[in-house]
Every structure is written in structure tokens, then in C-alpha cells.
Amino acid sequence: MAQSSLRLVENPTMDKDKSKAIDAALAQIERAFGKGSIMRLGKGDKVQEVETISTGSLGLDVALGVGGLPRGRVIEIYGPESSGKTTLALHTIAEAQKKGGVCAFVDAEHALDPVYARKLGVNLDDLLISQPDTGEQALEITDTLVRSGAIDVLVVDSVAALTPRAEIEGEMGDQQPGLQARLMSQALRKLTGSISRSNCMVIFINQIRMKIGVMYGSPETTTGGNALKFYASVRLDIRRVSTLKDRDEPIGNSVRVKVVKNKVAPPFKQVEFDIMFGEGVSKVGELIDLGVKAGIVEKSGAWFSYDSQRLGQGRENAKGFLRDNPDIAGRIEAAIRQNMGLVADKILENAVPTAEDFDEGEA
């Protein structure tokens, strides 16, 4: 017995009824909650490119896929001690200030070095700083600043130092499990809407801890519970790779940053760059490394050259040349930014996601 084929018949009357029902629902919602509480995404002014602020590292800006860290989002930077977490956050503040932005630093660790911050380009006269006594006070100050709508970048350093009031007022050794996780969860529920509306970037610096008794997978975890992992649009894992030396004298660290989570571009890219002691991110070093990857800077043996002009023999000499010739460095940077897609592909070639990446970035 032959089966008759089913045919889908369009019903114009049904489409009209649906349209009327949707319009009635939209009108009811706007009467109840105000104009603009619901709209068609393509009709409003909300459809726009992601606004970003540079991290101070050209390579990391490329790896993030949108040219920097996104505004109006929660960002988490975590890693071991002395890996460059605060340095990266201060560079972001400096870049925002260059564009006329207002920035704040909630120093829960009470460890901000203003001399070092100034060396990184931070304008201390315009930087708002708070050194709160408790975690509740720190997050209340953060909430007030974000709701003001006047802050462009706010850094909380660090989540691990946000000590709940009950823990401070209690005795040393008292067991109070989950206090910090509950505090962070409640704070992020309140903050997330204000952050989006005010277009303020909030950077949480976090530390890592070791989970006891883990047999398989990474034993590392971040402090403050799981809420921050979910609310963060970008999570950066920064690690120190090696120590840079001039003869036998340490002059800086080579660090690797992995984009563990990214809601605005493809994740799992990683990049390496130098952080020099007392100077911060070595921008000229990045120009050479990324320029070679993109084919903009030519390398022949130990010699580096750009546009038929020799930059120097050896990486350090080439860095010195670019430091003394900022106009040439600017042209190389502009060429790299124009070829950002090509550079990102080169970065991605060396960044194959592992099972640990998916475990960390699934939130």
C-alpha cells in the first residue's frame, strides 16, 4: 500500500493571529514594566560591535579575538603567585585612562604598589582606590561604583582576599564552610545587570588552590566557589614560563596566557609575551614575535628587518632599536592589527584544546 506524502500547508490566518498575540503580549509587558523592557533585537540600538579595552599586550588582544577585553562584562584573571595577574589588570587600567576612562581599584589584599602602577602608565591622580576591611564592604563599594554609571574599568584584587565579616569576627580556626562562595554568588547576582547597563568592565583577580585527593585531571581550582566561573564572559589563565636574564641578572619573566573561556570570540587560544621587572609588558618584544609570525617582520639568521630596513642582530638588539624608533614600532603595530585574523590563526596553530580546557571553560 503506497503511503501518501504529507504536505505542509501555510495558514496566513494563523500567522496573523500569532502576530496579534505577540503584539498584545509586548504591549502588556511594556505597560507593566516600562518602555524598552522588551523589544525586537534588530529594531533597537542594542545591535553593535563589542566595545573593548586593550590589555596592554598586543598578542593577548589578538588572542581574545575582538581586540581586547569586552566592556560591560565580568572578567576573571587567575594564576599562581607572581605570574603577572595584577600587572595585566593595571595595564588594562592604563589603556582605559588613555582613552579618558575613569577607573577604580578595590585593593582587598592591601598590596597595591603605586610606584609600580605609575611605571606601567597608570595615572594615580585619577585612579580611585579602596582598601576595604571585609568582603561585604568590598563588594558593596563595587556595586555602588558600578551603579553610578561613571566607571569604565573596576578591578577587584583579589577574590581570595574577600574575607566574610563572620570569619573576621570569629576565632582563628573556626570552621565556616561556604561563606565566601555564598558571598560571591549573591554579589554577582546583584552586579551582573548593573555591569551590563553601565557598560563597566569588572575584572576579578583570583588565586588558585589545590583540591585534595584528586586522582585524575587537574587538581587546581580557583577560590570563591563556582559562581564567578559562570558569570565571567572571559577567563584568563596566566602562568610564568621562564625567567629572562641579562647575563646572570634576572630582568623579567616570560608568561603564557590561555583564554580558558570566551563568550565574545572562540576560546582556547594562548599567547606568550615578556613582562619586564619595573616596566610591565614588553610591547616591542611582542611586535617582533607577532611580526615574524605574520610575515611582517623578516628574520634571516639572527637578523630582524622590516620594510628592507634592518632592526638589529638578535632579539634584544631589535627590541632596543624599536624602543628608540617609536614611529617604526607604530607602523609595525598598525600592520599587525590590520592582519589580526592571520596572526590569530598563527596563534591558534599552537593551541590545541585539551580535556582540561573544556572542564575549565564549560561554565
Swiss-Prot record:
Alphabetized Gene3D superfamilies for the sequence: P-loop containing nucleotide triphosphate hydrolases (3.40.50.300)
Function: Can catalyze the hydrolysis of ATP in the presence of single-stranded DNA, the ATP-dependent uptake of single-stranded DNA by duplex DNA, and the ATP-dependent hybridization of homologous single-stranded DNAs. It interacts with LexA causing its activation and leading to its autocatalytic cleavage.
GO terms for MF: ATP binding; ATP hydrolysis activity; ATP-dependent DNA damage sensor activity; damaged DNA binding; single-stranded DNA binding
Pfam families (alphabetical): RecA, RecA_C
UniProt GO BP: DNA recombination; DNA repair; SOS response
Protein's name in the database: Protein RecA
Family assignment from sequence similarity: Belongs to the RecA family.
Subcellular compartments: Cytoplasm
Tagged with keyword DNA damage: yes
UniProtKB keywords: ATP-binding, Cytoplasm, DNA damage, DNA recombination, DNA repair, DNA-binding, Nucleotide-binding, SOS response
CDD domains listed in its UniProt record: RecA
One of the record's GO cellular component terms: cytosol
Organism whose genome encodes this protein: Methylobacterium sp. (strain 4-46)
Binding site for ATP: 79-86
